[in-house]
């Protein structure tokens, strides 16, 4: 089963679409002998800078592997605040979300992206060899995707993190927070015989992700064997993919080890190193007295008054929300749920300000950072209209200030009328903003080529350095009473620091066992913070009574990281992009217009069988026939298409194709089929059927999906219209004559047929749902409503179909239980009907048919159906067959269905209501195969229902994470 699942996973994952950018963007491209950069004209400076870093990294980015990076295009997406990067086949490209990450370290974002994502291009090139390369000639790029199964995902990401770390002065994996979760867990990581939890994740407790795990194993192995052992693993796998377990075989063959041994040696060594460090005790005291029932994260505690602290709280059972904590009793009060918070909240005069990630109404790749506020006494979050690019809202004595980010890569401090405006220099990122009441100035946290530093905005609109740039990560800037408060890793741990604005001195305030974050002064001589342990991040407080001076340094102390082998690669921290470099780049590599119409098609794959890739994605239906298929997707992810030729004995030759385009916000689709047997719609079995001709059909459709993101709640409205034509033969039922005496049609054999069948469909759908918690599998509250109307505009004898549907989601009787109820109604209107009132020519909706029945068991005459389901988790086994199959969660659904419709009983000579029903259950098994990470969790569903007609009905289906 595991092998079949992986094959199905690849089949679906290879047709992944990143989502379209806004239609208003105008695209350009720069080509070099090694790469192509595709970018909107608004991001021209970002593209030039990124290209410069690519060229600087290229000579050493392949270190440890025998082959360098693929020649691959880089596609820039500048309007998405959810910073990320991705390397894909089908077609091959590197996707860059260029907005700098909010929570970042001391290397500029574009350098981080280049070091990490370009390393993936190296891995892919080393996997695309041998037999895998041969598959690419047979199957196109989808053949190359098979190679991705030959290195585990945790290693692919871990090796990329390792390169990102090696190409910086004090990079990602050296940050104390990168090992903090493992340090807090301690020996618990080695306490389980089955180690798959640490690869596959958990619904019961926190497990660091595969980036953290992969780096630790990769870095240990690199130091232990004095070489990149994954080069030989990739080399062996690409030439022997039929062995399936190629990683295990190669590790045994070349290094006499295996993944389990590497895991054990890695964490035995790490725990030995960490246990030898001097013991540290938290200097802060936890504020909340609430019991910790699951892994919990408090963030950004702020003093409301002397008795209350406001904080964001998230746990495995509930999504993010504001809570107040009584500082005396430790009791909590929930205030309001929020959406996905992008930057820290600020509080002043009874009002809370913060920002949230919110998708635009039309375009998937336009994700904004929306300015929000809430009056604390009312507890109702609201959005500030028009403020969609805001970061770090900060109340001042002249109004609200915030950081504004533009898609061209520039940051600025701006705000309400009267607030000093300052535009940051090019190539300078802003990662914090604070207002100090004593000095009446705005202060900021910046990152540039020199590292991270603190600055002040002067009354004349200029900026002053308070500290020099250093490769020391700073975070969570706040200010009060003449001091700046922030997180710093200068000591080798994540600790709370302050900067005295009067003396220009920096001090460390906290001492932590694992780490402390998000400081803010409470005005009562204390500093609030969050402090980490194995149960999560806790809201905490300590007096400001111990100031430990911090000496300026270019690098932090390296305390928690054991020695690892240093690679001879470029340090991107030393690479600068100057005005002269920009001029030189423009002279060597001219930017040209990138025409979207001319690049609508990019055939990346083919196969010697006929399949419909859209059905693979939409319906999980893999129908393979003899033939050939071409698959296309453009580099902007706005157009997908396929063309297939199939042959089968029953229909002969059939050609099918379809094109989907979503670059305008409206999703457009056209499709066509030619070949096979003409469809015949007879008025009855007694009507003679002619010899069918070749079948053909054309269809076109448009969907307008509108997303109304409102924080905790998301609403969606979808409007659809579709037209379909086929050359089907339709009985001329208007010519029928009926004999009342014999209750029969007298001329059925002579009415003939009419060629051509049109279908026009209109639909509207609306949904309203809330965010899910980590352990939720269905939205706990929400509903779905839809209605559709189908008609044949050219044949009055066809009945129209009207259909409505509704579904309600509610919580069950225990946490993470779900009770859902659904109902539908459909009926045929107009058209030709026999004396019994039944339509010969009508449409039918297959939505909500009692389980155990199908559409042949109902008709559309006053059809009503309802269903009731109750789903709950029953077990979190977290075990299985080590390294092969990991069972993460088992769920049970109990369901009952009911349906009824009108049908004419010819024996009784009257119309009756026929009723059907079924009841039973579904068993859901959430699992991972071959130590795939949490993001690759799949679901097996086994359904068993007893319908009112027939025997026991059962089915099995597989839900994939793509």
What residue ranges belong to the model's regions?
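A flexible loop/linker signature enriched in serine peptidases of the S9 family
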Residues: 173, 313-322, 337-342, 355-370, ...
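Acidic/His/Gly-enriched intrinsically disordered linker/tail segments
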Residues: 22, 108-113, 121, 126-219, ...
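Juxtacatalytic substrate-recognition/specificity segment
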Residues: 13-146, 246
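C-terminal outer-membrane beta-barrel translocator/porin domains of Gram-negative envelope proteins
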Residues: 677, 688, 735-892, 902-904, ...
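Outer-membrane beta-barrel initiation region
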Residues: 488, 546-665, 669-670, 749-780, ...
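Outer-membrane beta-barrel translocator/channel fold
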Residues: 494, 513-517, 534-537, 669-718, ...
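Outer-membrane beta-barrel "beta-signal"
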Residues: 762, 866, 920-921, 951-962
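Beta/coil-rich, acidic/histidine-enriched accessory regions frequently appended to metallopeptidases
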Residues: 18-29, 205, 232-350
């Amino acid at each position: 089963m595991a092998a079949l699942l992986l094959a199905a996973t690849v089949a679906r994952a290879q047709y992944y679409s990143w989502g379209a950018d806004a239609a208003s963007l105008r695209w350009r491209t720069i080509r070099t002998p090694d790469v192509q950069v595709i970018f909107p004209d608004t991001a021209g400076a970002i593209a030039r800078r990124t290209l410069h870093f690519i060229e600087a990294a290229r000579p050493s980015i392949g270190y440890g592997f025998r082959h360098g990076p693929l020649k691959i295009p880089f596609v820039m997406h500048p309007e998405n605040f959810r910073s990320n990067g991705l390397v894909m086949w089908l077609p091959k490209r590197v996707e860059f979300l260029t907005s700098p990450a909010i929570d970042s370290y001391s290397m500029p974002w574009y350098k981080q992206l280049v070091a990490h994502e370009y390393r993936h291009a190296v891995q892919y090139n080393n996997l695309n060899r041998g037999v895998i390369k041969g598959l690419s000639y047979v199957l196109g790029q989808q053949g190359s995707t098979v190679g991705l199964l030959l290195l585990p995902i945790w290693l692919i990401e871990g090796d990329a993190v390792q390169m990102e770390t090696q190409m910086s002065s004090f990079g990602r994996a050296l940050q104390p927070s990168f090992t903090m979760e493992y340090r807090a867990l301690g020996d618990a990581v080695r306490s389980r015989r089955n180690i798959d939890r640490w690869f596959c994740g958990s619904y019961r407790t926190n497990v660091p992700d595969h980036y953290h795990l992969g780096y630790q194993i990769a870095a240990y192995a690199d130091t232990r064997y004095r070489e990149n052992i994954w080069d030989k693993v990739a080399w062996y796998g690409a030439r022997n993919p039929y062995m399936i377990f190629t990683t295990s075989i190669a590790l045994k063959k070349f290094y006499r080890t295996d993944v389990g041994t590497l895991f054990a040696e890695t964490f035995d060594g790490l725990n030995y190193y960490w246990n030898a460090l001097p013991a540290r005790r938290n200097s802060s005291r936890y504020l909340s007295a609430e019991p910790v029932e699951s892994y919990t994260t408090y963030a950004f505690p702020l003093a409301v008054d002397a008795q209350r602290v406001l904080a964001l709280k998230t746990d495995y059972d509930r999504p993010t929300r504001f809570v107040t904590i009584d500082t005396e009793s430790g009791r909590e009060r929930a205030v309001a749920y929020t959406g996905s918070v992008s930057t820290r909240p600020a509080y002043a005069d009874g009002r809370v300000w913060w920002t949230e990630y919110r998708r635009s109404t039309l375009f998937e790749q336009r994700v904004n950072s929306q300015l929000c506020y809430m009056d604390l006494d009312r507890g109702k979050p609201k959005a500030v209209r028009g403020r969609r690019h805001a970061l770090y809202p900060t109340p001042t004595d002249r109004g609200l200030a915030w950081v504004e980010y533009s898609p061209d890569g520039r940051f600025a401090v701006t705000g309400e009328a009267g607030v000093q405006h300052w535009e940051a220099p090019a190539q300078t990122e802003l990662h914090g903003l604070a207002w100090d009441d004593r000095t009446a100035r705005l202060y900021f946290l910046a990152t540039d080529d020199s590292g991270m530093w603190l600055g002040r905005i002067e009354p004349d609109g200029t900026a002053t350095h308070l500290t020099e740039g250093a490769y020391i990560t700073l975070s969570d800037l706040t200010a009060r009473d003449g001091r700046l408060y922030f997180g710093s890793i200068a000591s080798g741990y994540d600790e709370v620091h302050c900067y005295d604005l009067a003396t220009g001195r920096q001090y460390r305030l906290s001492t932590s066992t694992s780490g402390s974050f998000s400081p803010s002064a409470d005005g009562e001589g204390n500093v609030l913070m969050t402090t980490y342990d194995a149960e999560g991040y806790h809201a905490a407080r300590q007096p400001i009574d111990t100031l430990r001076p911090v000496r300026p340094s270019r690098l932090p102390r390296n305390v928690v990281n054991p020695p690892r082998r240093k690679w001879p690669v470029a340090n991107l921290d030393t690479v600068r992009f100057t005005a002269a470099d920009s001029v030189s780049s423009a002279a060597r590599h001219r930017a040209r217009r990138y025409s979207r119409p001319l690049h609508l098609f990019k055939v990346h794959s083919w196969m010697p069988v006929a399949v419909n890739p859209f059905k693979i994605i939409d319906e999980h239906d893999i129908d393979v026939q003899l033939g050939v298929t071409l698959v296309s997707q453009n580099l902007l992810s706005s157009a997908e298409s396929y063309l297939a030729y199939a042959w089968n004995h029953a229909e002969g030759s059939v050609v099918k194709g379809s094109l989907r385009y979503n670059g305008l916000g409206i999703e457009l689709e056209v499709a066509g089929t030619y070949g096979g047997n003409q469809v015949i719609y007879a008025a009855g079995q007694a009507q003679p059927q002619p010899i069918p001709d070749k079948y053909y059909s054309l269809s076109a459709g448009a969907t307008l999906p509108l997303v109304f993101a409102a924080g905790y709640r998301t609403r969606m409205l979808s409007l659809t219209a579709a037209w379909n034509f086929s050359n089907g033969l339709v009985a001329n039922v208007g010519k029928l004559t009926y004999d009342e005496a014999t209750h029969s049609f007298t001329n059925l054999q002579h009415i003939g047929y009419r060629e051509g069948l049109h279908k026009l469909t209109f639909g509207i759908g609306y949904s309203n749902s809330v965010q899910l918690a980590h352990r939720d599998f269905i939205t706990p509250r929400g509903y779905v409503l839809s209605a559709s109307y189908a008609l044949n505009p050219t044949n009055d004898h066809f009945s129209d179909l009207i259909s409505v549907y509704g579904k309600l989601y509610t919580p069950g009787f225990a946490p993470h239980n779900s009770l859902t109820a659904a109902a539908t109604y459909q009926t045929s209107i107009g058209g030709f009907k026999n004396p019994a009132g039944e339509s010969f020519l009508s449409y039918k909706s297959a939505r909500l048919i009692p389980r155990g029945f199908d559409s042949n068991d109902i008709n559309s005459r006053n059809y009503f159906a309802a269903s009731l389901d109750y789903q709950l988790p029953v077990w979190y086994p977290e075990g299985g067959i080590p390294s092969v199959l990991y069972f993460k969660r088992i769920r049970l659904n109990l369901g009952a269905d009911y349906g009824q419709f009108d049908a004419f009983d010819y024996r009784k000579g009257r119309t009756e209501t026929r009723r059907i029903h079924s009841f039973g259950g579904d068993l859901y098994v959430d699992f991972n195969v071959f130590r795939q990470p949490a993001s690759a969790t799949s679901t097996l569903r086994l359904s068993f229902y007893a319908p009112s007609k027939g025997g026991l009905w059962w089915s099995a289906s597989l839900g994939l994470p793509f």
